[in-house]
């Protein structure tokens, strides 16, 4: 927190952080040619973690100062700036060199739910209710049925499982519902997990070798690269983070995957930090890598 407060203050843009920054100097590292400024989604993940820490460290002295520093960082973020003055949804990026040229509006149910929740609840620079409601626009807001499971506010075939992980590290879906997810976000997130599992067991090509102990599609390393695996983007690769980070939603089914990896693939899939990022039985491929954003939800 001291690093974020002291090293990044002059490099923050409207209080927001870049996608990447130098871990020693705090200066921005460009993620792409025009993505060399503020990233409000990555900022929201950081703020989510900081607010969790602020709620946990409730002591006096150093912990009291920690809470003040976190509050200062949280209050500095000008969420409303990222509506581009349109009062009609958030934009993902802003650059001091290119402005809003990337023009990527944030919409649909995905990992950005926490971005909208933090933006509308900011004590200093909140967006309006109208701007918040923009997330429901586009294909990401549709009631659908897959593999016998009805789901609210879903994109085509629900998307990767990290949609129900990243935002809900800090948000409690059991206490969330709105006009668009009337049955509540807990039911919605459980259902997305069950659909992901049901796709693997019932719908996916048999050659992919999915089973009750080998399922779970989400963003991960794959053989030869990286992708956001999902029922409509199936690369025959299971990422342990998919099922294991879904433990609150499907504890019994998720434990089956964990025990399978540990008991049957430990020599290939288990290292210092637990299970490696992904593996494919179809292609006899096993990652030897870790991705922090996959390990954290576990």
Residue map of PLM features:
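Ser/Thr/Asn(+Pro)-rich, low-complexity disordered segments
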Residues: 1-297
